Amino acid sequence: MSQKIRIKLKSYDHMLVDKSAEKIVKTVKSTGAVVTGPIPLPTHKKLFTVLRSPHVNKKAREQFEVMSYKRLIDIYSSSSKTIDALMKLELPSGVEVEIKV
């Protein structure tokens, strides 16, 4: 096949993203394909500010943040064996996987 496969991983837990990326790289390398990555993409931080009191005290506020972590993996010179191995791979439920061929 020898086409480029790009895998993007996204999660709110950086440990899950790193373990998933490591698992994918290990699986792909065992099939003989060339892998670049995992490349860490910028972390997005979303900040929410809410009032502590439901009625008064506008000055009393609380802030919450949600961080999303991303990794990028490129696979070159893949074969049907590589794609079969990726299809059978089980990843944690907290990781969003986007694959582009």
UniProtKB/Swiss-Prot annotation:
Q: Which Pfam families match?
A: Ribosomal_S10
Task: Specify whether Metal-binding is a keyword of the entry.
Answer: no
Q: List the disulfide bonds.
A: none
Q: Which InterPro entries match?
A: Ribosomal_uS10, Ribosomal_uS10_CS, Ribosomal_uS10_dom, Ribosomal_uS10_dom_sf
User: What is one cellular component GO term in this UniProt entry?
Assistant: ribosome
Per UniProt, the keywords (alphabetical) are: Ribonucleoprotein, Ribosomal protein
What GO terms are given for molecular function? structural constituent of ribosome; tRNA binding
**Cross-referenced PROSITE patterns, in alphabetical order?**
RIBOSOMAL_S10 (PS00361)
Q: How does it assemble?
A: Part of the 30S ribosomal subunit.
- Record-linked NCBIfam families: PRK00596.1 (NF001861), rpsJ_bact (TIGR01049)
Q: Which family does it belong to?
A: Belongs to the universal ribosomal protein uS10 family.
Q: What does this gene product do?
A: Involved in the binding of tRNA to the ribosomes.
Name-wise, this protein is Small ribosomal subunit protein uS10
